[in-house]
Amino acid sequence: MKSEIFSGTIPALMTPCKADRSPDFDALVAKAKELVGLGMSAVVYCGSMGDWPLLTTEQRMEGVERLVKAGIKVVVGTGAVNTATAAAIAAHAEKVGAHGLMVIPRLLSRGTVVAAQRAHFKAVLSAAPTLPAVIYNSPYYGYSTKADLFFQLRAEHKNLVGFKEFGGYADLSYAAEAITGADADLKLMIGVDTAVYHGYVNCNADGAITGIG
């Protein structure tokens, strides 16, 4: 599978709230339209910027659906406290017409166990087989996805088309050399705003998923 969704600058949206602390989806859509109008290629919702742990699954799904209905290209974050919820979010994203997935590792239980992460990634990727996806790698999750696991997953899930790296310069260089540099069809997305120059100039990155939303 090839996809052009993972290119250019893709801001991760925050979740605006009303006075009663419920999500303000009208404001969410308005901000997405503003950013796309300024030249952003798409938006991400819900990544960590969107405060997904504070939202219900239904609220997250509503936000995605509202963005899609507004004609916004949206990449959906799959962070969740369990694999079943992450897979349900991915399946919903595919159903309503989202454009891609940002697949978050297993977080709370056995996060350092490679077999557990493999099973988690497989479940999420299988739930939305037509949606292009990148794995989100972050040292803050306590687990790093390495090339061997990435290519095991890619061999079975053609919708895995790239890698977002949130670590520092060394992590981004590793991703470029060992993962995306090994296959010209793979996309490398910069995940740290301060590493944008390094990512584009030294790592041949395709785009950046940034915290400017």
Predicted regions and their residues:
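Catalytic alpha/beta core domains of metabolic enzymes, predominantly
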Residues: A123-P129, S138-G213
